[in-house]
Amino acid sequence: MKIKPVKLLVDEALAIVKTITASEVKSMLENPDKNILIDIRDIRELYNSGTIEGSRHMPRGMLEFWLDPQSPYYKKDIPVEVNKILFCASNWRSALATKTLMEMGFDNVMHVEGGYQSLIDFGFKKKGSPI
């Protein structure tokens, strides 16, 4: 059995997904009716380091289910038409998640270069632990 290394999967995703900078995120979020920032990190990461104020938490394991209008778990408060800006801790998981959403048919999905830390470094406000 030959296992494809995760780094190769990430590299393949990065080659086709849209990657945006923290600066671009800031500009996009000036229009919150058309853009949503989604934190796909595990809940334990949010407990340990907080999240970005105004972002929506959608754990990686539920993302596809929560965004699929055909799913019984669909989150109706996030319209299909809204641009979805994903971030994780660095950008590996968000690249893979963005690719998966593209495979589902979303053409309005992208991820943040450098992930959570790049948003913090740029000056996004941190919201504390959800506990």
Predicted regions and their residues:
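Short, surface-exposed ligand- or partner-binding patches at beta-edge/loop junctions that are enriched
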Residues: F87
